[in-house]
Amino acid sequence: MRKIELLAKSHDRDGFDCGSEPLNLFLKQTARQHATRGISRTFVLVEGGASESKPIMGFFSLNLCQLKSESLSAEEAKKLPRDVSGIRLGRLAVAREYQRQGIGKTLLVAAMGKFIEIFNTAGGIGLFVDAKDQEAKHYYEQFGFVSLPSNELELFLPVRTIQEALAQNS
């Protein structure tokens, strides 16, 4: 059984390869440091069970973010105060051997679930992501993310869209 877990020492970070060296290096060298410093949290998808070193199928990281509402669409901005909070999906990657098997969607749905946990405690207007390129942008758009007017590679998924998506997946 597959499980989403908070990144821990028991996870095999060194064996992870998604094909993108910056993402590999983040997981291997930076993710746990960011967690210790309170910068972000990284979650991994692993096969369940009690093994010594759990291979990582994929991961995502989340951090808090704040932005000016004017960076959103005019329709969204008019309903909000000047400064708004959300959650940033900092990174999302799938190990090469698991790519094109729906793992990215599994990770994204898990990130949405984590967003809702935070939303229920502290609020937030949605999930933000900086797509690394046009291909990544199109991937996120499949799930309802929309580009911000100020930067087409910065995308936003409103809380109501997340709630609807999770209701359909349950």
PLM features: residue spans?
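Non-catalytic substrate-recognition and accessory regions of acyl/acetyltransferase enzymes
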Residues: M1-Q101, K105-S170
